[in-house]
Amino acid sequence: MFCVQCEQTIRTPVGNGCSYAQGMCGKTAETSDLQDLLVAVLQGLSAWALKARELDIIDHDVDNFAPRAFFSTLTNVNFDSQRIIGYAQEAITLRESLAVRCRLHDATATVDHPMAALQLAGNDIPTLLQQAADFALDSDKAIVGDDVHGLRMLNLYGLKGAAAYMEHAHVLGQYDDAIYAEYHAFMAWLGTQPSDVDTLLNNAMGIGKMNFNVMAILDRGETDAYGNPQPTAVNVRPIAGKAILISGHDLKDLRMLLEQTEGTGVNIYTHGEMLPAHGYPELKKFKHLAGNYGSGWQNQQTEFAKFPGAIVMTSNCIIDPNVGNYGDRIWTRSIVGWPGVNHLEGDDFSPVIEQAQSLAGFPYSEIEHMITVGFGRETLLSAADTVIDLVAQKKLRHVFLVGGCDGSREERSYFTDFTLNVPQDCLIMTLACGKYRFNKLDFGTLEGLPRLLDVGQCNDAYSAIILAVKLAEKLGCGVNDLPLSLVLSWFEQKAIVILLTLLSLGVKNIYTGPTAPGFLTDNLLAILNEKFGMRAITTVEQDMNTILAA
């Protein structure tokens, strides 16, 4: 096993990465190695998808499957070895079918790629694990060096994050052939084990640019289906009654669950990245969308154990449900998997609803505690002139975007302390699950504007980018000249690709934490600092003073 893709990876004086029987996330060495094998197979599939496009053949089954299967290898998504093997088998079936189509079009069609003809050595796990050893992500690290290896991981993990957003967009019916062509090109290229530093750096930025377009179609899919988010008060305390908790990012699953539970007496609660759902008109209209439950994903083993109903995981992040003894009450969807946990196929939530009705539910309603969400793209843009006027009147000094992933590391208290130390004449925008570090605090208002503006899920970084561009246009300056600073927390691969997106758009002087990615060497961090001004967080006082003095 070798895995260095998340923030909690093991770090030692001799190297970084989880390389034992089990990773820090709970992923076994078995599952990790099988995921490496799956990635290699998917790289071969993408190589054939590129060849097919040369012949004017676009296979939508391949396009739909490839990012979804890649998504299953993200942190805290799928821990089920058999499901990973199933994805690899399906990838090979799709690849061979596509190869046949290509040869029917051109009998000489072939693909010169190291993974283009990769076959599984068997169907049993021991045999596949022996084969997987050849595809370990660090297999040639000693040869190519730490910097090249780190850049490969930056590209691979960034592309994983983009694949996740592609799948979210696909679920909502969004498709852009240019994006899929780019995805396959990057995926196939990574399978060739590239080693040129400049190419690796440039392609990392290319993945970031591609992801901006992915976030755009995802934004379109969500707003077309559910309307533009509106500022909405959300109760974060439970009310009496039967209950289902839904976590992850898939708003379509939430919509179906709301429709199927209407009139059943079962209340629906959002968790984690589902919180922004309360701002969408077509979702918040359901009266039994009762509120938001819990905090950051890392606390789920305690919080889910106390939840007296059924739980649905639609995407990341799932961690071992057996620790809290709620494995019989949790259901996985789509690419999510945990061994022995019920997996819900199709769109019928009846088994979940029946289970919720058989469980105790909340015995009484707690005193309400309301927070506000729903400051999406249109709401932010409508406030642009107000923000500009406040800046001109020197009533608004600075805007901070403080967001990203949450996690268990103690150093993440920095982000709570940072927001508490933001001066009263400044605004705070936030997005993604890092907001749980401070989103239940009262930051008050500034000239009628809430000082804390919840922009949405991690992919809603798109809205923040659009706002920044609009403000810069109105003020006749560049985005980097705005009184705007980004202070981002990262944990997994979606955060990596959003960082690449920001860097690819020329956004500079981003503060990141709580630690640097374990795959980035000191040399690579120095390059990112030199080119983009990207820097690690230090102390709240020092960083705040530096930002406001700029």
Curated annotation (Swiss-Prot):
One of its GO terms (molecular function) is hydroxylamine reductase activity. The keyword Iron-sulfur applies. Gene3D superfamilies: 1.20.1270.20, 3.40.50.2030. GO terms for biological process: response to hydrogen peroxide. It comes from Pectobacterium carotovorum subsp. carotovorum (strain PC1). [2Fe-2S] cluster binds at residues 3, 6, 18, 25. Its main location: cytoplasm. HAMAP family: Hydroxylam_reduct. This is Hydroxylamine reductase. Keywords: 2Fe-2S, Cytoplasm, Iron, Iron-sulfur, Metal-binding, Oxidoreductase.
